Design a protein with these regions (language model features):
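Long amphipathic alpha-helical segments used for membrane anchoring, targeting, substrate engagement
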Residues: 49-141
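Post-HExxH zinc-binding segment in Zn-dependent metallohydrolases
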Residues: 52-54, 58-78, 263-294, 309
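Pan-zinc metallopeptidase signature
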Residues: 59, 317-369
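Short helix/loop segments within enzyme catalytic domains
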Residues: 154, 158-160, 164-166, 170-171, ...
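Active-site recognition of the HExxH zinc-binding catalytic motif
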Residues: 167, 214, 237-250, 276, ...
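Catalytic zinc-binding patch centered on the HExxH motif and its immediate surroundings
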Residues: 189-215
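Short pre-active-site segment immediately N-terminal to the catalytic Zn-binding motif
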Residues: 220-237, 263-269
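Catalytic Zn2+-binding segment of zinc metalloproteases
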Residues: 243-259, 281-282, 286-288
Length: 369
């Protein structure tokens, strides 16, 4: 498989890691979905795959929340990260604001640049990370799932807890150790290990400090400017996508991507589509994730929730952003994240299979959609 990676556009062979069975060089076959239209996929999704998910998404009110996984940096000047971007650039997330479109294109094209080398069986050495115990509102207000009813921002905590509980279990089952990442919630601007950033960039993952960053106002922007349906599960998809980048960083997949290469089959697009698939894999297992004491974090996920997440993927495809947000003609040569159809395909591949080995976007002959 490394040879196939080397031959694919925008790739070079990753360093041999030998730690996780689902790393890029060990991926097997890819799952495919009907390709006739987005509407067709939605019908298949609604009618056959998730009929057992009937009630709306429901966070367990009695679940104790681990706020150490979320750092509320609002009003604190941001996380004390590094200065310049250096060789480790932020990996782009789900989408961007209109104001940040140019920044988005620049950062996205650089996605997956120089990353830390090596990931031994014990996991990569942890950099200095922030903590949710910094006195922010989230740490003060969010103790149980029921607290979401009085402070909507608490929602980010069980989502992050659930995502990391799944990946910790998945890594352990494959004989390795998952290194948790802190989600930094900021307002307008922040400092990171990848350099300073503003809300215009959208949610992103910084490989230099192995953390996720998000201004929660992005969720509202998804609805008002991008036209997404929104909702808890759509918001969860955004964060799960960023944690997909964290997984790629930990297992070495990101090192196979050459910086600055764009296009419909480029390394950047393949990386983003795989992160979408990983987000879907988590979503498939969301109702099985638990707190440290074994209580479920998410009790119910509905068909409407799944449809809202898929709708969000549609709204942040490169073709949608270029034509609907940027008012330009679609130019596939500038794709960095994949088309709406591609993003939907890989998100639903993860949702349907629940298997990270099915998230093969790197093989030479894989059908990206």
């Amino acid at each position: 498989m490394p040879g196939q990676l080397a031959e694919a556009e925008g790739f070079e062979p990753p360093d041999p890691l030998g730690t996780l069975a689902f790393k890029a060089s060990a991926f097997g076959r890819s799952a495919t979905l009907p390709r006739d239209s987005l509407a067709s996929r939605r019908r298949v999704l609604d009618q056959r795959r998730y009929l057992w998910w009937d009630p709306p998404v429901d966070f367990n009110p009695d679940a104790e929340l681990d706020t150490s996984q979320v750092s509320d940096d609002r009003g604190s000047g941001g996380y004390g990260g590094g200065g310049g971007l250096g060789g480790r650039v932020a990996i782009g997330g789900g989408g961007v604001s209109i104001v940040g479109l140019i920044i988005y294109l620049v950062l996205s094209q650089l996605g997956g640049g120089s990353l830390p080398s090596g990931f031994d069986d014990g996991g990569a050495s942890a950099p200095s990370q922030g903590s949710g115990t910094n006195g922010g509102e989230i740490a003060q207000n969010c103790h149980f799932g029921r607290d979401i009813k009085t402070d909507a921002d608490c929602e980010v905590v069980p989502i992050v807890n659930s995502i990391q509980n799944y990946w910790s279990t998945e890594f352990a089952q494959r004989g390795s150790k998952y290194q948790p990442a802190v989600t930094h919630v900021f307002s307008q601007s922040t400092n990171t290990g990848c350099g300073p950033a503003t809300a215009d960039v959208g949610p992103f993952y910084c490989p230099a400090d192995k953390n996720v960053y998000i201004d929660l106002s992005f969720y509202q922007e998804l609805q008002t400017r991008f036209g997404a349906k929104g909702g808890p599960f759509a918001r969860a998809y955004v964060l799960a996508h960023e944690y997909g980048h964290h997984v790629q960083d930990l297992i070495g997949t990101s090192r196979a991507v050459k910086a600055g290469v764009t296009g419909a089959t480029s390394g950047s697009v393949r990386l983003e589509l795989q992160a979408d698939c990983y987000a879907g894999v988590w979503a498939n297992h969301a109702q099985q994730t638990t707190t440290a004491s074994g209580k479920p974090l998410i009790e119910n996920v509905s068909q409407a929730d799944v449809a809202a997440a898929v709708d969000t993927a549609d709204r942040i495809g490169d073709d949608y952003i270029q034509s609907k947000i940027g008012g330009q003609q679609v130019d596939q040569s500038q794709f960095t994240h994949g088309s709406s159809a591609q993003r939907e395909k890989w998100l639903t591949t993860g949702l349907r299979t629940g298997d990270p080995t099915q998230c093969d976007t790197f093989s030479k002959n894989v059908n990206l959609g």
